[in-house]
Amino acid sequence: MKFIDEALIRVEAGDGGNGCVSFRREKYIPKGGPDGGDGGDGGDVYLIADENLNTLIDYRFEKRYAAGRGENGRSAGCTGHRGNDITLRVPVGTRAIDNDTQEVIGDLTKHGMKMLVAKGGYHGLGNTRFKSSVNRAPRQKTNGTPGEKRDLLLELMLLADVGMLGLPNAGKSTFIRAVSAAKPKVADYPFTTLVPSLGVARVGADRSFVVADIPGLIEGAADGAGLGIRFLKHLERCRVLIHLVDIMPIDESDPAQNISVIESELYQYSEKLSEKPTWLVFNKIDTIGEEEAQARAQEIAEQIGWEGDYYLISAATGQNVQNLTRDIMDFIEANPREVAEENTEADEVKFKWDDYHQQAMQNPIEEDWDNFDDDWSEEDEEGVEFVYTRS
């Protein structure tokens, strides 16, 4: 299935139903009083995280999603039905953004987590609500309010512990294949990897971490060169970044310069992302021998002013790969992910007597029924009363 990590959709919550103006009419009860019911609340629109999904492709074709409108109130004090809610299923890791204001509404980072993205309109009040000792036959009501409407940008951000950085053909996909059961495409030409992929690296019987591979960056990626930097967002939730460097590039480019290019593009994209813990890993040491690789790696580290440790591996042959994965696992266990307490339940619907209805009671809509005769009276000119008889 095609990997789609962005989609723009329109969500429309349902309008609230209008209140009803009605009076009770029954045999032998000539002055029954008001019995108009309230309208129903409009339906809400929710997003829910589903671990069985891994792409937003469904939302590329159907763009509009509308919840049900609340029904109008009816006579006999009947309240209108609430509008039907709709729930849209998205992959775990999806972020919802209001496309007009760029407000981040929330992140769905756990399976089953539910989020309200468009609130339904409030119900209108029927004339029964306006009955009082001085207003015994009220003809006032209120209308329901419109539901919330939004242009919603959905962004899928992969949830991984480790993120891979590097130029095209640095060996990132080969490394993923070496440490996990994932099988991303590997070839000897640039941009073999076109979409992000995940792999689960197992260290021993009961220890594992998730590693994310993204398409390689090139100089000018922040300005749109190559595949740009659109996939860097998938690294935002990683705990550590692995900067994989070809120690002896086939194009004879300078590895130190290549490292500077990646660091520059990363900083231009996000200063926060560039401050994440980053490990320097020199790959393809099997092409030049370990002793020469040691000397060359030390020289490169001095050129770029690298102060921390670095690793030398060969993803193709597996040389030193186990030591690297073991150290990554130890680092991840020593630095657990900071998880804020997140409510997996959606916001509850407010009680119907909220501030809106308190204000609406002050400015009701008056029904103008010039010919409406709510009760029979002896003062009527004809003095006629209808009597129902069974035939």
Swiss-Prot record:
Primary location: cytoplasm
Coiled coil: none
Keyword tags: Cytoplasm, GTP-binding, Hydrolase, Magnesium, Metal-binding, Nucleotide-binding
Residues noted as binding Mg(2+) in the record, renumbered to the chain: 173, 193
Residue ranges occupied by any OBG-type G domain in the UniProt entry: 160-333
Localization: Cytoplasm
Cofactor: Mg(2+)
Gene Ontology terms, MF aspect: GTP binding; GTPase activity; magnesium ion binding
Domain annotation Obg: ranges: 1-159
Known function: An essential GTPase which binds GTP, GDP and possibly (p)ppGpp with moderate affinity, with high nucleotide exchange rates and a fairly low GTP hydrolysis rate. Plays a role in control of the cell cycle, stress response, ribosome biogenesis and in those bacteria that undergo differentiation, in morphogenesis control.
Protein name per UniProt: GTPase Obg
Originating species: Actinobacillus pleuropneumoniae serotype 5b (strain L20)
Gene (name only): obg
